[in-house]
């Protein structure tokens, strides 16, 4: 899924377009390049909403619950999650039964983050495993080793 970020307005679109072109014959790989501030998917009994995260996170469950595009599947799902990024550090909480997970950043510290004192966050990637009936059943983290 493609999301425009506040740091990158065009590069991610071109990367997604290039990857979609490269994998065009692979039916198991899909690319969502639609311009939207929110996106969602359903995996079994779990609704997963996606948002950049540059907002008040506690408002996100209501945003998805009232969205014309996602309110139906949001309401029918047994489990509900919203995944965000933006803040470049990991955080997870539950708001009104919806798990909100802010993903860690893969990127290092650039000048803007350093000047703003947004430093020392653990760089990592998460792999989340879902079961059709039981929702999220596992989470794996791979930390990025820093070169000094």
Go through each PLM region and give its residues.
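Extended amphipathic alpha-helical segments with heptad-repeat/coiled-coil character used for oligomerization
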Residues: 7-10, 14
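Conserved beta-sheet core of the metallophosphoesterase superfamily
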Residues: 18-37, 42-43, 47-147
